[in-house]
Protein backbone atom coordinates (compact mmCIF):
# COMPACT_ATOMS: atom_id res chain seq x y z
CA UNK A 1 0.00 0.00 0.00
CA UNK A 2 1.43 3.37 -1.06
CA UNK A 3 1.25 6.49 1.12
CA UNK A 4 -2.16 8.18 0.75
CA UNK A 5 -3.37 5.03 -1.05
CA UNK A 6 -2.08 6.25 -4.40
CA UNK A 7 -2.20 3.98 -7.45
CA UNK A 8 1.19 2.89 -8.79
CA UNK A 9 0.87 5.27 -11.76
CA UNK A 10 -0.56 8.18 -9.76
CA UNK A 11 1.53 11.28 -9.01
CA UNK A 12 1.00 13.17 -5.80
CA UNK A 13 -1.51 16.05 -5.89
CA UNK A 14 0.06 18.80 -8.01
CA UNK A 15 -0.63 22.49 -7.44
CA UNK A 16 0.95 25.26 -9.50
CA UNK A 17 0.46 28.86 -8.34
CA UNK A 18 1.59 31.43 -10.91
CA UNK A 19 2.73 35.03 -10.26
CA UNK A 20 3.78 33.97 -6.77
CA UNK A 21 6.25 36.84 -6.34
CA UNK A 22 5.94 40.35 -7.75
CA UNK A 23 9.42 41.23 -9.05
CA UNK A 24 10.40 38.32 -11.31
CA UNK A 25 9.28 38.11 -14.95
CA UNK A 26 7.89 34.67 -14.16
CA UNK A 27 7.29 33.11 -10.76
CA UNK A 28 5.63 29.94 -9.54
CA UNK A 29 5.04 28.02 -6.35
CA UNK A 30 4.90 24.36 -7.36
CA UNK A 31 3.69 21.69 -4.97
CA UNK A 32 4.07 17.94 -5.46
CA UNK A 33 2.30 16.71 -2.34
CA UNK A 34 4.40 18.03 0.55
CA UNK A 35 7.33 19.02 -1.67
CA UNK A 36 7.18 22.76 -2.33
CA UNK A 37 9.50 24.79 -4.57
CA UNK A 38 9.51 28.47 -5.53
CA UNK A 39 10.65 28.93 -9.14
CA UNK A 40 11.42 32.39 -10.55
CA UNK A 41 12.48 33.44 -14.06
CA UNK A 42 14.71 36.48 -14.59
CA UNK A 43 15.23 37.97 -18.06
CA UNK A 44 18.44 39.88 -18.81
CA UNK A 45 19.51 41.59 -22.04
CA UNK A 46 22.91 39.92 -22.09
CA UNK A 47 24.42 36.50 -22.68
CA UNK A 48 27.44 34.66 -21.28
CA UNK A 49 30.77 35.67 -22.77
CA UNK A 50 31.04 32.48 -24.85
CA UNK A 51 27.81 33.41 -26.69
CA UNK A 52 28.44 37.11 -27.35
CA UNK A 53 27.94 38.06 -30.98
CA UNK A 54 26.50 34.68 -31.95
CA UNK A 55 22.90 35.84 -32.18
CA UNK A 56 21.41 33.41 -29.73
CA UNK A 57 20.22 33.41 -26.15
CA UNK A 58 20.77 31.25 -23.10
CA UNK A 59 18.69 29.57 -20.42
CA UNK A 60 20.33 28.56 -17.17
CA UNK A 61 19.26 27.59 -13.66
CA UNK A 62 20.25 27.66 -10.02
CA UNK A 63 18.92 25.36 -7.30
CA UNK A 64 19.00 25.49 -3.54
CA UNK A 65 17.28 24.21 -0.43
CA UNK A 66 16.31 26.29 2.59
CA UNK A 67 18.05 25.09 5.76
CA UNK A 68 14.85 23.78 7.33
CA UNK A 69 13.27 22.42 4.17
CA UNK A 70 14.33 19.01 5.48
CA UNK A 71 13.62 17.03 8.66
CA UNK A 72 16.61 18.53 10.45
CA UNK A 73 18.34 21.84 9.74
CA UNK A 74 21.20 21.75 7.27
CA UNK A 75 23.87 24.38 6.78
CA UNK A 76 23.38 26.93 4.04
CA UNK A 77 25.82 26.31 1.23
CA UNK A 78 26.79 29.98 1.42
CA UNK A 79 27.96 29.35 4.99
CA UNK A 80 30.09 26.46 3.74
CA UNK A 81 31.63 28.67 1.08
CA UNK A 82 30.86 26.37 -1.85
CA UNK A 83 28.07 24.48 -3.57
CA UNK A 84 27.82 20.75 -3.06
CA UNK A 85 28.08 18.23 -5.88
CA UNK A 86 24.38 17.33 -5.59
CA UNK A 87 23.36 20.98 -5.98
CA UNK A 88 25.51 21.47 -9.07
CA UNK A 89 24.23 18.25 -10.63
CA UNK A 90 20.59 19.23 -10.07
CA UNK A 91 20.86 22.78 -11.36
CA UNK A 92 22.62 21.56 -14.50
CA UNK A 93 19.83 19.05 -15.02
CA UNK A 94 17.21 21.79 -14.62
CA UNK A 95 19.04 24.06 -17.07
CA UNK A 96 19.49 21.32 -19.70
CA UNK A 97 15.84 20.39 -19.43
CA UNK A 98 14.60 23.96 -19.88
CA UNK A 99 16.93 24.75 -22.78
CA UNK A 100 15.28 21.88 -24.65
CA UNK A 101 11.97 23.77 -24.69
CA UNK A 102 13.38 27.01 -26.15
CA UNK A 103 14.66 27.94 -29.62
CA UNK A 104 17.72 29.81 -28.39
CA UNK A 105 18.25 31.58 -31.72
CA UNK A 106 14.68 32.91 -31.69
CA UNK A 107 15.24 34.10 -28.10
CA UNK A 108 17.89 36.52 -29.33
CA UNK A 109 20.88 37.69 -27.32
CA UNK A 110 19.28 37.58 -23.89
CA UNK A 111 19.49 35.23 -20.95
CA UNK A 112 16.82 33.76 -18.71
CA UNK A 113 17.84 32.42 -15.31
CA UNK A 114 15.55 30.08 -13.40
CA UNK A 115 16.04 30.09 -9.63
CA UNK A 116 14.55 27.04 -7.92
CA UNK A 117 14.40 27.29 -4.13
CA UNK A 118 13.07 24.33 -2.17
CA UNK A 119 11.08 25.50 0.84
CA UNK A 120 9.89 22.03 1.87
CA UNK A 121 11.34 18.71 0.74
CA UNK A 122 9.50 15.38 0.69
CA UNK A 123 11.15 13.70 -2.28
CA UNK A 124 11.27 14.69 -5.95
CA UNK A 125 12.64 18.20 -5.50
CA UNK A 126 14.47 18.18 -8.84
CA UNK A 127 11.45 16.96 -10.79
CA UNK A 128 9.18 19.49 -9.08
CA UNK A 129 11.74 22.21 -9.84
CA UNK A 130 11.78 21.37 -13.55
CA UNK A 131 7.98 21.25 -13.69
CA UNK A 132 7.52 24.58 -11.92
CA UNK A 133 10.39 26.32 -13.69
CA UNK A 134 8.86 25.36 -17.03
CA UNK A 135 5.73 27.34 -16.16
CA UNK A 136 7.73 30.30 -14.84
CA UNK A 137 9.84 30.30 -18.02
CA UNK A 138 6.71 30.12 -20.18
CA UNK A 139 5.22 33.14 -18.39
CA UNK A 140 8.46 35.11 -18.79
CA UNK A 141 8.71 34.38 -22.51
CA UNK A 142 5.02 35.05 -23.12
CA UNK A 143 5.51 38.46 -21.49
CA UNK A 144 8.36 39.20 -23.93
CA UNK A 145 6.04 38.41 -26.83
CA UNK A 146 3.16 40.43 -25.40
CA UNK A 147 5.28 43.55 -24.85
CA UNK A 148 6.76 43.34 -28.35
CA UNK A 149 10.32 42.45 -27.32
CA UNK A 150 9.98 39.20 -29.27
CA UNK A 151 8.04 39.02 -32.53
CA UNK A 152 7.42 35.28 -32.26
CA UNK A 153 7.58 32.86 -29.36
CA UNK A 154 10.71 30.69 -29.12
CA UNK A 155 8.86 28.10 -27.04
CA UNK A 156 8.82 24.57 -28.45
CA UNK A 157 6.43 23.09 -25.89
CA UNK A 158 6.18 22.22 -22.22
CA UNK A 159 8.67 20.16 -20.22
CA UNK A 160 7.77 17.99 -17.23
CA UNK A 161 9.69 15.63 -14.99
CA UNK A 162 8.77 12.84 -12.62
CA UNK A 163 10.51 10.26 -10.48
CA UNK A 164 9.77 6.56 -10.82
CA UNK A 165 11.21 3.62 -8.97
CA UNK A 166 10.88 0.11 -7.66
CA UNK A 167 9.76 -0.03 -4.03
CA UNK A 168 9.19 -3.36 -2.30
CA UNK A 169 9.37 -5.04 -5.70
CA UNK A 170 6.70 -2.81 -7.26
CA UNK A 171 7.20 -0.12 -9.92
CA UNK A 172 5.68 3.19 -8.78
CA UNK A 173 5.44 6.79 -10.01
CA UNK A 174 6.41 10.00 -8.17
CA UNK A 175 8.17 8.78 -5.06
CA UNK A 176 7.83 10.71 -1.83
CA UNK A 177 10.58 10.60 0.77
CA UNK A 178 9.58 7.40 2.58
CA UNK A 179 9.40 5.58 -0.76
CA UNK A 180 12.57 7.13 -2.16
CA UNK A 181 14.59 6.16 0.91
CA UNK A 182 13.45 2.53 0.56
CA UNK A 183 13.62 2.24 -3.25
CA UNK A 184 15.57 -0.59 -4.85
CA UNK A 185 15.67 1.41 -8.08
CA UNK A 186 15.35 5.18 -8.42
CA UNK A 187 14.90 6.99 -11.73
CA UNK A 188 14.18 10.56 -12.85
CA UNK A 189 12.66 11.13 -16.29
CA UNK A 190 12.33 14.47 -18.10
CA UNK A 191 10.03 14.65 -21.12
CA UNK A 192 8.84 17.09 -23.76
CA UNK A 193 5.14 17.59 -24.26
CA UNK A 194 5.31 15.64 -27.54
CA UNK A 195 6.58 12.54 -25.72
CA UNK A 196 10.27 12.83 -26.57
CA UNK A 197 12.66 12.32 -23.68
CA UNK A 198 15.21 14.87 -22.56
CA UNK A 199 16.90 12.95 -19.78
CA UNK A 200 16.68 9.59 -18.03
CA UNK A 201 18.65 9.15 -14.80
CA UNK A 202 18.34 5.67 -13.31
CA UNK A 203 20.23 3.89 -10.56
CA UNK A 204 19.87 0.50 -8.92
CA UNK A 205 20.21 1.26 -5.22
CA UNK A 206 19.77 -2.41 -4.35
CA UNK A 207 19.20 -5.23 -6.83
CA UNK A 208 19.95 -4.48 -10.51
CA UNK A 209 16.82 -3.91 -12.60
CA UNK A 210 15.89 -5.83 -15.73
CA UNK A 211 15.20 -4.54 -19.23
CA UNK A 212 11.51 -5.31 -18.69
CA UNK A 213 11.50 -3.32 -15.46
CA UNK A 214 13.18 -0.42 -17.26
CA UNK A 215 10.41 -0.37 -19.87
CA UNK A 216 7.78 -0.54 -17.12
CA UNK A 217 9.38 2.43 -15.35
CA UNK A 218 9.56 4.47 -18.56
CA UNK A 219 5.90 3.73 -19.26
CA UNK A 220 4.99 4.85 -15.74
CA UNK A 221 7.03 8.02 -16.24
CA UNK A 222 5.19 8.79 -19.46
CA UNK A 223 1.82 8.37 -17.74
CA UNK A 224 2.96 10.55 -14.85
CA UNK A 225 4.35 13.27 -17.10
CA UNK A 226 1.11 13.37 -19.09
CA UNK A 227 -0.77 14.10 -15.85
CA UNK A 228 1.79 16.77 -14.98
CA UNK A 229 1.42 18.35 -18.43
CA UNK A 230 -2.32 18.57 -17.77
CA UNK A 231 -1.61 20.40 -14.49
CA UNK A 232 0.77 22.80 -16.26
CA UNK A 233 -1.75 23.52 -19.01
CA UNK A 234 -4.51 24.17 -16.47
CA UNK A 235 -2.26 26.57 -14.56
CA UNK A 236 -1.24 28.45 -17.71
CA UNK A 237 -4.86 28.71 -18.86
CA UNK A 238 -6.05 30.13 -15.54
CA UNK A 239 -6.62 33.85 -15.06
CA UNK A 240 -4.26 35.17 -12.40
Swiss-Prot record:
Binding-site residues for phosphate, renumbered to this chain: 86, 124-126
Pfam families for the chain: RNase_PH (PF01138), RNase_PH_C (PF03725)
Family assignment from sequence similarity: Belongs to the RNase PH family.
Subunit annotation: Homohexameric ring arranged as a trimer of dimers.
Top-level EC class as recorded in UniProt: transferase
EC number from the UniProt entry: 2.7.7.56
Species: Mannheimia succiniciproducens (strain KCTC 0769BP / MBEL55E)
GO biological process, one term: rRNA processing
Function, as annotated: Phosphorolytic 3'-5' exoribonuclease that plays an important role in tRNA 3'-end maturation. Removes nucleotide residues following the 3'-CCA terminus of tRNAs; can also add nucleotides to the ends of RNA molecules by using nucleoside diphosphates as substrates, but this may not be physiologically important. Probably plays a role in initiation of 16S rRNA degradation (leading to ribosome degradation) during starvation.
Entry keyword annotation includes Iron: no
GO molecular function: 3'-5'-RNA exonuclease activity; tRNA binding; tRNA nucleotidyltransferase activity
Record's protein name: Ribonuclease PH
Entry-linked PANTHER family: EXOSOME COMPLEX COMPONENT, EXOSOME COMPLEX COMPONENT RRP41
Catalytic activity: tRNA(n+1) + phosphate = tRNA(n) + a ribonucleoside 5'-diphosphate
Organism superkingdom: Bacteria
Keywords: Nucleotidyltransferase, RNA-binding, rRNA processing, Transferase, tRNA processing, tRNA-binding
Coiled coil regions, renumbered to chain: none
Amino acid sequence: MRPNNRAVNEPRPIKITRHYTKHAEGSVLVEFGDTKVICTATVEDSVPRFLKGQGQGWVTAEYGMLPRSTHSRMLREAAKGKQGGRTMEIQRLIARSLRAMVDLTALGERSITLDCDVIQADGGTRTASITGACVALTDAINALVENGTLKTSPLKGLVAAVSVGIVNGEAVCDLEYVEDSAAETDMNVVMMEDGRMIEVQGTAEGEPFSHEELLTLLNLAKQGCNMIFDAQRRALAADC
